[in-house]
Amino acid sequence: MSIKENITQIIRELPSDVKLVAVSKFHPVESIMEAYGAGQRVFAESRPQELAAKVPAMESWLAANGMQNDIVWHFIGHLQTNKLKMVLPYASLVQSVDSLHLLEAIEKWGRDNGKVVAVLLEYHIASEESKQGFSEEEIKGILSDVGRFPHIRFR
């Protein structure tokens, strides 16, 4: 089954209030174009370099074909603070904020750039120490003091 056929079938079966997020990591821009042709509009990347390359490529392709840029990009996976400049100009949602250090760095980027960044906090439910994310207490602390993060929209 082609990408277009697969996405068309999935979208047809989804309730109207559910959005499909297509993870495009490791796929070439041509695959994103095919998915776009099937009606897919929300894409996610987990590698900053890929996001920073694919967004302008898709913007150019849409413009060259006289189409409106209605793609929404998410960032998934672990994000390092030194990669924020590659991700935040493009991602409408960062799905993987896993530390206070990263949250504070995103707040600073938003303040410096006059932007509000939408984020999801990663909740650490595993007992494994190697896993990342916030504890329940940390999340409660952050959410009780959201005024500290005026450039972040918690979703």
State each model region's role.
Residues M1-R155:
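Conserved alpha/beta-domain cores
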